[in-house]
Amino acid sequence: VVQSFQNCMRENDIAPEDVVFVAHSTTQATNAFIEGDVANVGVVGVAGGGLEGFLAKRQLALKDIVLDEKVGRMIKVFNTFIKKKMLTEEVINKNIDDLISQGAQVIVASMAFGVDSMDEEMMIHDCAEKKNVPVSMASDITKLYGLTRRTRTAAINASILPKMMATANATESS
């Protein structure tokens, strides 16, 4: 991990003082995750039609992610699905608004075969970003094939985004 950070800093001409907040915010986000201080996640799933869409819709519909069964800590997950041919800014914005009205605080964009083309996930990302809603793209988080696994990984990551960003911003402004 250290070698990766050093390579990244060297290759991108990043000064060490510019990265201090990353470690702190990541630690705080990890602590928040362990303690269950996580954001509710809205998943915007996308797939083509026919059998692909039928199967993907089921794989994209995540259940709440249990963090600690004994005390009931979980990541609350809300789901919506858009057929690829219906994917427009207007439709995306309506679906994001619906997820937010249900209680989602962050958005995950996930598409069947998204690792092969991230364009559709990027459309969702851009719409959420314009609304100032934290967003994570499943295919950007992991290149694993396996729609449910990729989406779940992105949902877990997205659930700690608000805490991580708040800590990073607080650290940077101090």
Model-inferred region functions:
Residues 1-174:
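N-terminally biased helix-coil "hinge/interface" segments that flank
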